[in-house]
Amino acid sequence: PTSLLAIAVTLGVLFQTRYRIGIDPQETLSMTDRVFLVDIKNRVVEKGASYVFAVKNAEPVYEDGREMVKRVAGMPGDFVEINADFDITVNGQKVGKGFWHLQGQDPVFVREHFTGSRLLGDDEYWMMGLSEKSFDSRYFGPVRSEQIRGKAYGIF
């Protein structure tokens, strides 16, 4: 029994040095899962995969450093565009629509500040949730690799 306990403790410690559990507390989910296994050692970014990252430039909605889970919709070298109808495309492929959080705001202000296009730089990733209500790169712009905490795997 003592050796089994030692093995269990060792495995637990090894698990905690690589993984942690993340829970999305939002009422309206922006991803398909609420609970995630986060591999904090895996920061190799792949398009379409989900990652936990520390947000920047999202104030006053979220303080800098708040962790979020979103999927990678755009990689370095990809062309991101948000048109006047608020369609969001990456390399010409539609990946989302709208600015749900800006409803009721002055439409001129929204179009001036939230439309346009850009080529993602060497260390820039366009992160998006799966819901139009997701607060993501549409609002705070690209995420850099230094902000990424680990790859997220949906559990349930």
Regions found by a protein language model. Name each.
Residues 63-97:
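Mid-length scaffold segments of soluble, non-membrane domains
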Residues 43, 73, 96-106:
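A short, sequence-level motif marking secondary-structure junctions
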Residues 46, 75, 83, 120-122, ...:
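Residue-level recognition of short, solvent-exposed, well-ordered loop/turn junctions
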